[in-house]
């Protein structure tokens, strides 16, 4: 009888600790010390939320930097999500997979020697918000032409917004870069 009572007490204590106190403590720590990150790292422009620093978006206009291709086609449509059951993730296809090869060829829209790897392939999450500085610099002439500004101004903007990679190439956040472009005075 004593063993049963001890087992029930331990179960209740574990449920309270793991199911209530620990989540409450982590939520409080997140809200107090990491408020921006705990709430999605949302970016506001013109008094409205335009996206998250953590999730890439599908950019198609020539006047904006384009992010990495998405393995899940930036699946933010609830109908698609219900049908496909995927909201993020890589393709998990091998280098020899014909569908992957076709998708990469589709994303390579200009001379093959001029394409960075991140311009043609998706990230592991399928929603990476960053591109390499090299990729951004290769897009600079297109953006400069579309906005009727000098390529050097666009390149300066890229250099000003770049973030240092630890074990990776330097990179830029596409959404932040595009907002900076919109804020740029002609």
UniProtKB/Swiss-Prot annotation:
GO terms for cellular component: plasma membrane. It comes from Staphylococcus aureus (strain MRSA252). Part of the high-affinity ATP-driven potassium transport (or Kdp) system, which catalyzes the hydrolysis of ATP coupled with the electrogenic transport of potassium into the cytoplasm. This subunit acts as a catalytic chaperone that increases the ATP-binding affinity of the ATP-hydrolyzing subunit KdpB by the formation of a transient KdpB/KdpC/ATP ternary complex. Belongs to the KdpC family. The system is composed of three essential subunits: KdpA, KdpB and KdpC. The chain crosses the membrane at residues 10-30. GO terms for molecular function: ATP binding; P-type potassium transmembrane transporter activity. This is Potassium-transporting ATPase KdpC subunit. The keyword Zinc does not apply. It is found in: Cell membrane. It is a single-pass membrane protein. Keywords: ATP-binding, Cell membrane, Ion transport, Membrane, Nucleotide-binding, Potassium, Potassium transport, Transmembrane, Transmembrane helix, Transport. InterPro entries: KdpC.
